Amino acid sequence: MREYRIKDTLILACDHGYGNIKSCHSVFKASAEVSETAPIFSKDYVKFKDKYYVIGEGHKSFLADKIADDDYYILTLVAIAKELALRGLKEAKIHLAVGLPLKWVKTQRDSFKAYLLRNRYVNFEYREKEYLVEIAGCTEIGRAHV
């Protein structure tokens, strides 16, 4: 597996689409449904700050501003966990490379970056495995559909 690093920092790409979240090695539905209790039937969930988020089972309504709720933050954690799991890691220092639609790069770049960097150290569970991640930085890249 090819990896990109800046010194000891792993660079992870994540495209925050309205229908799907895409990383280098995974694609999943952009859906996170919050609950105060652990889900009974699904193992595809994130536990973060005493809340549970079931991933990929519903459909997220369109929001032009992706920072209007916590969903894209949680979905980013899922993308991180999936990439780390492929590498056999549970802890990592990472730099996010994220895609935003060209139409919104200029107006949302700074706010989306702050949204993703709001917690430098993030401790969460995904699929009943604990992860500890240091999000050292974030680069926003405009994306276009061909």
Show where each model-derived region lies.
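Nucleotide/phosphate-binding catalytic cleft detector across ATP-hydrolyzing
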Residues: 1-143
